[in-house]
Amino acid sequence: MAEAGLRGWLLWALLLRLAQSEPYTTIHQPGYCAFYDECGKNPELSGSLMTLSNVSCLSNTPARKITGDHLILLQKICPRLYTGPNTQACCSAKQLVSLEASLSITKALLTRCPACSDNFVNLHCHNTCSPNQSLFINVTRVAQLGAGQLPAVVAYEAFYQHSFAEQSYDSCSRVRVPAAATLAVGTMCGVYGSALCNAQRWLNFQGDTGNGLAPLDITFHLLEPGQAVGSGIQPLNEGVARCNESQGDDVATCSCQDCAASCPAIARPQALDSTFYLGQMPGSLVLIIILCSVFAVVTILLVGFRVAPARDKSKMVDPKKGTSLSDKLSFSTHTLLGQFFQGWGTWVASWPLTILVLSVIPVVALAAGLVFTELTTDPVELWSAPNSQARSEKAFHDQHFGPFFRTNQVILTAPNRSSYRYDSLLLGPKNFSGILDLDLLLELLELQERLRHLQVWSPEAQRNISLQDICYAPLNPDNTSLYDCCINSLLQYFQNNRTLLLLTANQTLMGQTSQVDWKDHFLYCANAPLTFKDGTALALSCMADYGAPVFPFLAIGGYKGKDYSEAEALIMTFSLNNYPAGDPRLAQAKLWEEAFLEEMRAFQRRMAGMFQVTFMAERSLEDEINRTTAEDLPIFATSYIVIFLYISLALGSYSSWSRVMVDSKATLGLGGVAVVLGAVMAAMGFFSYLGIRSSLVILQVVPFLVLSVGADNIFIFVLEYQRLPRRPGEPREVHIGRALGRVAPSMLLCSLSEAICFFLGALTPMPAVRTFALTSGLAVILDFLLQMSAFVALLSLDSKRQEASRLDVCCCVKPQELPPPGQGEGLLLGFFQKAYAPFLLHWITRGVVLLLFLALFGVSLYSMCHISVGLDQELALPKDSYLLDYFLFLNRYFEVGAPVYFVTTLGYNFSSEAGMNAICSSAGCNNFSFTQKIQYATEFPEQSYLAIPASSWVDDFIDWLTPSSCCRLYISGPNKDKFCPSTVNSLNCLKNCMSITMGSVRPSVEQFHKYLPWFLNDRPNIKCPKGGLAAYSTSVNLTSDGQVLDTVAILSPRLEYSGTISAHCNLYLLDSTSRFMAYHKPLKNSQDYTEALRAARELAANITADLRKVPGTDPAFEVFPYTITNVFYEQYLTILPEGLFMLSLCLVPTFAVSCLLLGLDLRSGLLNLLSIVMILVDTVGFMALWGISYNAVSLINLVSAVGMSVEFVSHITRSFAISTKPTWLERAKEATISMGSAVFAGVAMTNLPGILVLGLAKAQLIQIFFFRLNLLITLLGLLHGLVFLPVILSYVGPDVNPALALEQKRAEEAVAAVMVASCPNHPSRVSTADNIYVNHSFEGSIKGAGAISNFLPNNGRQF
């Protein structure tokens, strides 16, 4: 009802106006004209964008019959008005020529859709030439140009049937402008743009002289059927060609990209869901429940039926029974390893100074390679594999098109400014956000101009570098001025001119007069960025001062839909050319960027209360990573000091205050740290000799990691030496050797396992991680070798000092009186013996422990299935980095994602008709062509991650060739048959490149090669908006046979418009390539970037398969997507299976080494493996809960976790395996007491202090992936090593080795015989049940230790 009432009111107003107006059109009858012929220029107009056509003369006369050339011209321009030889019309031949000229601009945009172009031409042909013109045209204003001349028509009304107008508009509403990736109607609807355009607004713009293109004012009235205007007026209601219908046998229908009705049915793709289901539950959860249930049943059986206690009743193996071959092999392994390290330790301890010198020499020689160290700081070189597909694609793209330009960007908000309401004369009431305020825009303009004129001194060039030396200038790349530089901001809508920004004017619209200012112009340009002259009284252009349009998503952000006035952020972007590494211009660009950053910091401080400013330069990410690395070096140094202090204090065995300085181990601890650092420096130097580049991350992390691992071995070795009682008459060197023989096999097991894991971690293709793994692996090996040599020598010297009661550090000083050293067992050992071990191994506790760890394993498995994969670039930055705010604003306010180029390689012939049709998306092209498939993908952005279709040089080239004002030839003179630019106004340029055809325009092979270079060099302008210089000059390269080649050959400055490729150009022939640019939707995190890459590659593979079917296409031809971020996120496409493979690969040698060094004990190896797997699973599960994503950095930590887990489990497992206690429970208790305390003090407590210090690091990468993850690994390793492992060993641990038990019994009997012989009145009490200091194992004879020492049992029994 309301709509009907409104229409009635409008009709009443129209009738009233007709009654009051002067009747210039007195006759409204069929066969009569309203005007005829031309009367000159419109005297009311000035300042038009181009030379306007003449206006018609008032003439209310009958239509004329036209003949001859006039009729031919009518048939050519207005074919629908041609009715044969008796055709009548209301236009002269001059009017037809003018009509053709005025339609040429619009036809250039609409010609890709023949039905739209025909409907548009037909509409204006009827207005100008219809024989029934007076029926729907009513002249409303005329001008008298001179005495005796007919009045000139300067305004009229056109009456259309509403359906006729709607159908005409609908046929054009989807036609695209490929180069701008926008709709053509966006340039033909004024302030409303494509989003708010409709038939009425589309027609109104065409009749508005304010647009600088219309020669007179036309008021369009759209009437519904049955609505009568009176005075004989009948609305025009001609037939309209539908865009999906052909207009003849040779005329193609509009393509899907330009006509929705032409699109085939495309099913919405299903969202990718990697979750598999079993019934209604996720399959992973079902499998986890089943697995945990099986484990729970096994646990219940173990506890309920007391498997272990039942077997505990069996006593020690009867020595009289024989031993199996496997028992003998296991025993021999223990014996050989123990004897070797015992003899080695004795020898080294006997020659400490010599060994130290011999150890220092190779370390210094290898460390000298550090002088050749080259640090890599480029993030691409650090975090992407050089041989990866993405790096190869990047190299291919950069080789042929140059590196992607360097972005320097500023994002500003004004959180303290309130929004306000503005009544726009054009669009009505609009809400403007606080950032869109004039004083803020003036501040931004001042900043932009200061940055534009920024200069910086270059020592290398010995001159000042300005923006014009390095900027990206798409429309004038060869002779760039400061105002050719690509700067995108809202201020470009005013050509960065303060006067234009402050300009105001009064304007009357629909009887309402109001003042218009910058806000109206902004609204106009945001809706129609391709406008050369807005429709306001300001009459300003929307084009940037460098000549290109500025789309709203490049200038503002934070708006919803098309409500541009509600934007919450202003965006300013300076685009610089990028250059290959080593190019001096790259250093100049970085110098300018450094000055840019300084200027922005000053602006940020100055405008703190007005703006919230975020910014970045292309160099920012690399600078910030390097900055935080340097700032975190003291944190790592503190971590080393903390570990050193702990080792120094904890290694000492203190019995009284007076002996503290003697019993302290500061020198030994410092020596141990020096051994680790020497190993690290030697490893780094070795790889520097090989030319393998290092990084600051390696300098930070490798010493810390190896120090943690090395400190474990140092602590366990010294602790074993202190706890192992010296035998009567045993020399110090033999004592040290005996201690080393007891722990060195497990030290070898840990070091070898860790080194193997690190070397296997080097299989990752990421350079930073690969070099880190190689360096760490070699450092661990060198550290073990130095511990077996240099540190043993240091321990020998320190023991000699302590035995002589000399002070630590100041070894030359000897106190006068000192009490004898105490023999206490220590608090930790007492706690483990009296409290911890009895409680842990109680039968109730053991069952609870198994169930709790089983539940932990199940929860971790489930959490592991939900871990986030990827590495957000924000995590590479310190917490105080200014880039964090920039990335936050980028994700919050940017309305479009990164550009993605679909690149074609060698082997495709673009010059053939089939080749063009398989690429383009206009009329006559394949429904599933290259660009059409990309268009289909943009319809489903949630699955394809594409938001804006690809710009297509093939489409714009075809449109450029279509007979219009674009491609013209000189018809005479010295330039005959050469290209005549559209900017040349000459009668000598009337020849079109292509002849008029009814079908789709396709050049021949010869024409293709001749005209394409002209197209690529043609600068777009209002007469020819299809010129390819700005959009495609660096995207297309051709060989003489139509295949694409390097741009240098085609766009060489020496190449003129000759129509042929000169001989010298062929010298530049390189690999063929071309590219088509689309845009991603906004990508917020690592997962979005990864999935966007996956989707783009799937789309490119699909396109490749279709294009290979085009005749003449090379089978090796390929299309691939390229985005600058691909090199960082490609690894996450396959990191899950690769990580599982790598971790599984690490477990295999770890298991093998464990079995071998544990005396070929398969069960011990399996229990080690089970514990390590549980530690890994629990670690990954807690990673998901603590927000640690899974990526290459965390993967290498998980690889090292395999090695670190060996530290927690192997010592206790070996202690259990070589124990000869009668029952599993007793052996588990003994291993927990003797070695568990050493693992806690030596492994966990040497890791934790250093790890906790890392929590203070500024770099989030260090905090998350080294502090959090290593803390998890250490705590979970500690829990599994000291809680789960003793319990599971007490149930299913390996049996006592009969050979080991037999040998121990023989040794005990021999000792007893010696004791009886030497002390017959004091019978020996030989027992091993109460020993808590050392493990039970067999040791071979030691020469020089005395006869008794050769037969003493290895349980440390004192006599």
Curated annotation (Swiss-Prot):
It catalyses: cholesterol(in) = cholesterol(out); sitosterol(out) = sitosterol(in). One of its GO terms (biological process) is vitamin transport. It is a multi-pass membrane protein. Residues 632-797 form the SSD domain. Residues 22-284, 373-632, 688-696, 764-776, 868-1139, 1190-1191, 1258-1268 are extracellular. InterPro entries: HMGCR/SNAP/NPC1-like_SSD (IPR053958), NPC1_MLD (IPR053956), NPC1_N (IPR032190), SSD (IPR000731). Keywords: Cell membrane, Cholesterol metabolism, Cytoplasmic vesicle, Disulfide bond, Glycoprotein, Lipid metabolism, Membrane, Signal, Steroid metabolism, Sterol metabolism, Transmembrane, Transmembrane helix, Transport. It is found in: Apical cell membrane; Cell membrane; Cytoplasmic vesicle membrane. Residues 306-351, 654-666, 718-742, 798-846, 1161-1168, 1213-1236, 1290-1359 are cytoplasmic. GO terms for cellular component: apical plasma membrane; cytoplasmic vesicle membrane; plasma membrane. Induction: Expression is decreased in Caco-2 cells upon PPARD activation. Plays a major role in cholesterol homeostasis. Critical for the uptake of cholesterol across the plasma membrane of the intestinal enterocyte. Involved in plant sterol absorption, it transports sitosterol, although at lower rates than cholesterol. Is the direct molecular target of ezetimibe, a drug that inhibits cholesterol absorption and is approved for the treatment of hypercholesterolemia. May have a function in the transport of multiple lipids and their homeostasis, thereby influencing lipid metabolism regulation. May be involved in caveolin trafficking from the plasma membrane. Belongs to the patched family. Interacts with RAB11A, MYO5B and RAB11FIP2. Interaction with RAB11A, MYO5B and RAB11FIP2 is required for proper transport to the plasma membrane upon cholesterol depletion. Interacts with NPC2. Interacts with LIMA1. This is NPC1-like intracellular cholesterol transporter 1. It comes from Homo sapiens (Human). The lineage of its organism: Eukaryota, Metazoa, Chordata, Craniata, Vertebrata. The gene is NPC1L1.
